[in-house]
Curated annotation (Swiss-Prot):
GO biological process: nitrogen utilization; uracil catabolic process
EC number: 3.5.1.-
Protein name: Putative carbamate hydrolase RutD
Enzyme class, first EC level, given as a word: hydrolase
Domain AB hydrolase-1: 14-123
Length: 265
């Protein structure tokens, strides 16, 4: 898989692993890199079957498959401890890693994530799949911002979104890869295993997320023994892009607290 390392490169530098959502792109995290790379080594990567990590994803592809692929990359790079930050699908990957290899994680930050299928989100993804199958990639890409951002932000950033749409269409993944990634996130269900996740966890959610109800993060916080919730009022599903400054500050505060606790121990 394509990956990039940014920030501090000393062997003892605290390491952050950032995992993006359905689009799978390392570039999703560009609004966070200036804030995070001052004090941390930051790994971003293109998930398999997306962007610069071409592959034909097999039938039965799952969130666990994605977690295992990332663990193999981290093993290759010699990363044995990290703080994991994942957006939506990337948050599910982090939750899966917390079950597969809890000793890897110093802390976990799932953003607008969930633990089991939700009828509202399933309806949204069904609409996106229908757009893809019936109208093609251009319609799918054009509709994407409606699920990701607040209406006023979309109106104020129309030129930027036009550029983003053109880039997304030019780099659109194989249709079956996208279908299998959506199927994987819709099938994800670790409800019965939540009490096993004891990694220090900060859940970040947005009240105005129209794709994933913020109550899904509240549910995670209520059912994981070492988790808390930070709830933002504005920014939509991708507030890390649409309102990055308060989002970044929440991350920095969390990481400072976690790294301080490690140093004290």
């Amino acid at each position: 898989m394509h990956y990039e390392l940014h920030g501090r490169m000393e062997p003892d530098a605290p390491t952050l692993v950032l995992s993006s959502g359905l689009g799978g792109a390392a570039a999703f995290w560009l609004p966070q890199l200036p804030a995070l790379t001052q004090d941390y080594r930051v790994l971003v990567y293109d998930q398999l079957g997306t962007n610069k990590s071409p592959a034909n994803l097999p039938a039965g592809y799952s969130i666990e498959s994605m977690a295992v692929e990332l663990l193999e990359l981290l093993d290759t790079l010699g990363i044995r401890r990290c703080h994991f930050i994942g957006h939506a699908l990337g948050g599910l990957v982090g939750l899966q890693i917390a079950l597969l290899r809890p000793q890897l994680l110093q802390s976990l930050v799932p953003i607008n994530a969930w633990s089991s299928p939700n009828p509202h989100s399933a309806r949204c993804f069904a609409v996106r799949l229908k757009l893809l199958h019936d109208s093609g990639p251009a319609a799918y890409v054009q509709a994407q911002s409606l699920f990701l951002y607040p209406a006023d932000w979309i109106a104020a950033n129309s030129e930027r979104l036009a550029r983003d749409d053109a880039h997304a269409l030019a780099h659109f993944p194989p249709t079956m890869n996208l279908v299998r990634r959506i199927e994987a996130l819709l099938a994800f269900d670790i409800e019965a295993e939540l009490p096993r996740i004891t990694t220090p966890t900060l859940l970040i959610a947005n009240r105005d997320d129209m794709l994933v109800p913020w109550q899904r993060s509240q549910h995670l916080a209520d059912n994981m023994p070492n988790a808390q919730l930070a709830l933002l009022n504005y920014g939509g599903h991708a507030s890390s892009v649409s309102d990055s400054e308060p989002f970044n500050q929440i991350l920095l505060d969390h990481l400072a607290e976690q790294c301080g606790q490690v140093a004290a121990a």
